[in-house]
């Protein structure tokens, strides 16, 4: 992917699928330095206790004025994703010359060996937007946690929690540690 690194836009998912062993984390839009094409890469995380071997999704990419540029299915096959690991970020699901303004992802089926979990009947839950900290609070929290990039108010909801780095952890993940920045939820809350 070295040719695709010039331009990168990273957008976190603003919804999640309750009960799913896999979480849709973010969309990355990469622009080719030579081709000028936009590649859509999706990142998912295994939040279960088992190794995942395949994932089937449906996605829709929209351009300017909400025009659908692509609507398709994509399969991540022959993968071996251990609990807590992320995947998909190296696979372009769609490449276009046009500007992409939004990407919608629906989880269909996830596999662990021969076992399958059907997710298409589960209604997705929209996440509240993470709340930005004031610059003073941001500095104080980063200093206390000895980390940078903590720009958001840590929040706990009935369906999960937001870390100060902006990462959402659904209750299905069952962790007090942020898998993205390593912060401890309990320390963040105090």
Residue ranges and their predicted role:
Residues 32-35, 154-155:
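Short, solvent-exposed loop/linker segments at the N-terminal edge
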Residues 34-41, 88, 138, 144:
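Short, solvent-exposed loop/turn segments enriched in Ser/Thr/Gly
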Residues 57-59:
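Hydrophobic beta-strand segments
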Residues 7-16, 88-141:
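Terminal connector regions
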Residues 65-99:
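Intrinsically disordered, low-complexity Pro/Gly/Ser/Thr-rich segments with frequent PxxP/GP/PP motifs
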Residues 117-190:
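Cys/His-clustered metal-coordination modules, chiefly Zn-binding fingers
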Residues 43-49:
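Asparagine-centered strand-capping/turn motif at beta-strand->loop junctions
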